[in-house]
Amino acid sequence: MSPVPPIRVRALTAAPTRADGQYVLYWMTATRRLERNHALDHAAQLAETLQKPLVIFEAISAGYRWASDRHHQAILDGMLEHERVLASKAVCYFPYVESKPGAGSGLLSTLADSACAVITDDSPVFGTPRLLEAAARL
């Protein structure tokens, strides 16, 4: 794993890293892969620097405008693969599939409360900008 170029890192808030947190939280949203993923690499590097565990949180929401069975199946297949690959790694993988719209409301905030930092993907497409705006308000 090579260092993440600074141009690939953007702080959403001025909040400092909390060294007393329990873990570094990587919230997987747009870049749903384990390789060639700058945000995941950055989270892993921060966890190593802080000597804290890395928690990878990957969620799928039930009720958003572009939800479709085909898209969700691709995400679910990826989640199963991530679970398989990460089972032998020194990380905690937390996949979450929302059972009904709104059921996962507050979950990210709860996880963030115990985290040293929350690292996530940054992408100008799909719903990512709105997700990041909401996360910055946590």
Give the residues covered by each predicted segment.
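Trp/Phe/Arg-rich N-terminal binding region typifying the photolyase-homology
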Residues: 1-138
